[in-house]
Amino acid sequence: MNSIWAVVPAAGSGRRLGGEIPKQYREIAGAPLMEHTLRALLESPDIRGIVVALDPSDRRADAIDSLADVRVQTTPGGAERADSVMAGLELLATEGAEEDWVLVHDAARPCLPLESLTALIERARRSGEGVILAEPVADTLKQVGEDGQISGTVDRQSLWRAQTPQLFPLFA
């Protein structure tokens, strides 16, 4: 593993959340969610640089102080999350090396402890394979038939909730 880059898709409108302000710009603890997210990534000495994929018509990005950090660059994002991730990967393809890795982390997920990020990176280094953060499913899950009636309880023993960041070889 050579360098680790981060791609932060941030072009979304947050339709599911609703409201006038996209969720990455909603404030908690005095700063937009994306500001907290970028600070968490910038805190890691393992991350060489960050590409933030923004909506080309975004007028709120000026509120994100971390975008001015020399390790952060922006690129136009797309209509969907996958489009924004691809835009970030395409930019990195021109700068990254064959041995580089990329970490994808959502702009509106600010609660990323440095310890979790470091453990994720160490696991990738040891295994040489892509890794994700995940946690066991704790909620009871029900299976429902076509008639809308509960037909059973799902065994959660092997079920995990995928989270971000997700870390993979850049040129995989």
What are these model-predicted stretches?
Residues M1-S57:
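N-terminal glycine-rich phosphate-binding loop and ensuing alpha1 helix
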Residues V102-L103:
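Short aromatic/hydrophobic "clamp" motif used to bind/position activated sugar donors
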Residues C111-A172:
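Conserved core of the sugar-phosphate nucleotidyltransferase
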